[in-house]
Amino acid sequence: MTQRRTRNILAKRKERRFVSGLPKVELHLHLEGAAPPAFIRGLAKEKHLDISGIFDGRGNYRYRDFWDFLKVYEAATSALQTPGDYQRLTLAVLEESAASGVVYSETFLSPDF
């Protein structure tokens, strides 16, 4: 590896660290769309819902295109059945956001109950 390339790689890493440390804002966050896969998987298990087909081998949501995304979204949100579920989801999303450096969030939700 050349010295120039090494410097470029190090500069990019430094830039990423700098940017990741900046405070962030979410100006249009859909609560259900931001649901962590692990949260939805756990909630579905509590409710005895089998939505395992929406996750890939690493536990992430699995979809190929927008239409697939809509099917996954529908299955994932089927686990959100009560105000308490939304309370727990809100906490999970805000914790994840805070860990990413989000200091302000305008969050929208669309409960279906």
Residue ranges and their predicted role:
Residues 2-113:
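Metal-cofactor-binding active-site regions of metalloenzymes
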